[in-house]
């Protein structure tokens, strides 16, 4: 059992997410390896879209699965239905049960779920580090603006 208070979090790197994840997947995998050697908890967050009429990230579909290119090194996979990962009761319980207070964050969308999660983690008093070479967006032109926001 890990006793680290640090967690590496990968947000929404799923089949239905932007194709731009392919540009950062090697960086994410390298960061996962780094986090494992540092003794961090590794967490994967998946978005499930339960809104009627939507077609992507639907529960039980191939689109909501984590991308096959990503290293999955733990069973810590939590589902959210809103942009902020802290709204996942299971993820919040995991944080509390493990005394986690510091997060290293990767994923998509930089202007959506990553931004919302990092904002709310910071607001809750956690230390948050966004790995700039491990985030992407549907609109790549917005990534530099988001990096300025975080850094």
Can you name each region flagged by the protein language model?
Residues 22-25, 53-59:
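Short glycine-enriched, charge-decorated loop/helix-capping segments at active-site entrances
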Residues 17, 51, 137:
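Flexible, glycine-rich phosphate/dinucleotide-binding loops
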Residues 1-7, 30-38, 55-151:
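Active-site-adjacent betaalpha module
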Residues 47-49, 133:
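Active-site loop/turn elements of alpha/beta-hydrolase fold enzymes
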Residues 14-20:
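Short acidic, Gly/Ser-rich segments with clustered Asp/Glu that frequently serve as metal-coordination loops
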Residues 21-35, 39-47:
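A short alpha/beta connector and helix-capping loop motif
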């Amino acid at each position: 059992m890990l006793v680290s208070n640090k967690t590496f979090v990968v947000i929404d790197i799923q089949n239905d997410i932007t194709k731009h994840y392919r540009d950062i997947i090697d960086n994410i995998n390298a960061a996962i390896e780094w986090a494992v050697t540092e003794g961090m908890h590794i967490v994967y967050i998946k978005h499930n879209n339960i809104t009627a009429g939507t077609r992507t990230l639907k529960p039980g579909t191939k689109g909501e699965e984590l991308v096959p290119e990503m290293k999955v090194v733990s069973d810590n996979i939590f589902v959210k239905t809103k942009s902020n990962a802290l709204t996942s009761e299971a993820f919040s319980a995991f944080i509390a049960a493990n005394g986690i207070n510091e997060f290293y964050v990767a994923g998509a969308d930089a202007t959506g779920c990553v931004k919302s999660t990092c904002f709310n983690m910071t607001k809750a008093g956690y230390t948050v580090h966004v790995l700039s070479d491990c985030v992407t967006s549907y609109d790549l032109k917005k990534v530099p603006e988001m990096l300025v926001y975080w850094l």
